[in-house]
């Protein structure tokens, strides 16, 4: 197959996306596919004489083969990317990206956050008739916006921490229940997320979250164990328990090797396992998700589950959760990536 892997972008998860994209491209090439790895924002700025040649040479915008070299030599800073791009317009999709994707059998979305995950890119690809991995524009939009996600969960009677959506600092000051969690409405990888214990901490956390987005979500803090349940083709995988060695499960805990103890399959009884998988399936269906996703949960001391949020384009880095869950089912990361590119669930 001829496959385009899209990575990079302009979200706060740009660096993680580049790492995911590099891994995905390597896995697909190991299966014999012709793979072009593109930065969706930077695009391919040279004049294209022969798109076929890009596939045959397995073009990569990172100009390297190893993961470490790829990421090290790639623009990971958003400001630097904007300055380097020749096209100075506000367009999210870089030059020649659509044209190259149109010549592929499928486009593998290794993007995280922002326009690459919130449904905008998905809708654009739909309009051009370009096949891609992951959920469509509707599910992507619902899952990316934490305020909308919470509303859907409440309408479908899926238990979730109580919370509010705020569009400015003044309105956010109405919140008076502590401890609580403050987070950007559509961010990922826990960037800009804070746990606060009192009003003074809360004001600082609100300012911090608003640096990243114009809307924030504030919700009750629930004490409990944290789990994540991946789904492939609507089938829930074994839950994985996430236990940071210190503090919250923040950006550093997610991507720094050894910062978090991740146990899969989780050390839980059959009843709890079923409860988490069933809740994940309900959330997956309620948000109109497709293909694959990951749903995050908290489990309190009473055994009550709280559905936190959904991730429509789970990471593919060495520390990513969904590949670990798939491995428990006997699906290697290479096989998982290969089969996602084929959009088949025949291995389940």
Language model features with spans:
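ATP-binding N-terminal substructure of ATP-dependent carboxylate-amine bond-forming enzymes
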Residues: 1-138, 142-144, 148, 167-173
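A short, polar/charged loop-to-alpha-helix boundary motif
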Residues: 249, 317-324
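Phosphate-binding site of ATP-dependent enzymes
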Residues: 197-278, 299-306
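Active-site nucleotide/adenylate-binding loops and adjacent lid/helix of ATP-dependent enzymes
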Residues: 3-7, 11, 19-22, 94-101, ...
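Residue-level detector of anion-binding/catalytic polar loops
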Residues: 34, 131, 159, 215, ...
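Conserved small/polar residues in nucleotide/adenosyl-binding loops
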Residues: 337-344
């Amino acid at each position: 197959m001829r496959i385009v892997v899209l990575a990079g972008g302009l979200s706060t998860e740009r660096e993680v996306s580049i790492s995911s994209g590099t891994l995905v491209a390597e896995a697909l090439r190991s299966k014999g596919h012709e793979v072009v790895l593109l930065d969706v924002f930077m695009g391919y700025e040279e004049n294209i004489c022969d798109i076929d040649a890009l596939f045959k040479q397995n073009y990569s915008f990172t100009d390297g083969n190893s993961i470490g070299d790829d990421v090290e030599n790639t623009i990971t800073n958003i400001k630097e990317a904007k300055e380097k791009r020749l096209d100075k317009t506000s367009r999210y999709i870089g030059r020649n990206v659509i044209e190259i994707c149109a010549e592929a059998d499928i486009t593998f979305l290794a993007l995280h956050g922002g326009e690459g995950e919130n449904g905008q890119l998905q809708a654009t690809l739909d309009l051009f008739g370009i096949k891609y991995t992951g959920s469509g524009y509707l599910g992507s939009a619902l899952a990316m916006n934490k305020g909308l996600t919470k509303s859907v969960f409440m309408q479908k009677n899926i238990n979730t921490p109580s919370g509010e959506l705020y569009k400015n600092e003044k309105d956010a000051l109405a919140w008076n229940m502590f401890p609580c969690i403050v987070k950007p409405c559509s961010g990922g990888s826990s960037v800009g997320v804070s746990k606060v214990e009192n009003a003074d901490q809360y004001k600082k956390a609100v300012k911090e979250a608003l640096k990243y987005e114009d809307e924030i979500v504030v919700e009750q803090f629930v004490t409990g164990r944290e789990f994540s349940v991946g789904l492939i083709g609507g089938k829930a995988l074994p839950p994985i328990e996430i236990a940071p060695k210190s503090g919250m499960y923040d950006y550093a805990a997610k991507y720094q090797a050894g910062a978090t103890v991740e146990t899969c399959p989780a050390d839980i009884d059959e009843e709890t396992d079923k409860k988490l998988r069933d809740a994940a399936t309900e959330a997956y269906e309620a948000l109109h998700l497709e293909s694959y996703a990951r749903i995050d949960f908290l489990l309190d001391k009473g055994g009550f589950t709280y559905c936190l949020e959904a991730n429509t384009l789970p990471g593919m880095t060495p520390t990513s959760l969904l590949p670990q869950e798939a491995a428990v089912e006997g699906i290697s990361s290479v096989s998982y990536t290969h089969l996602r590119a084929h959009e088949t669930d025949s291995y389940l």
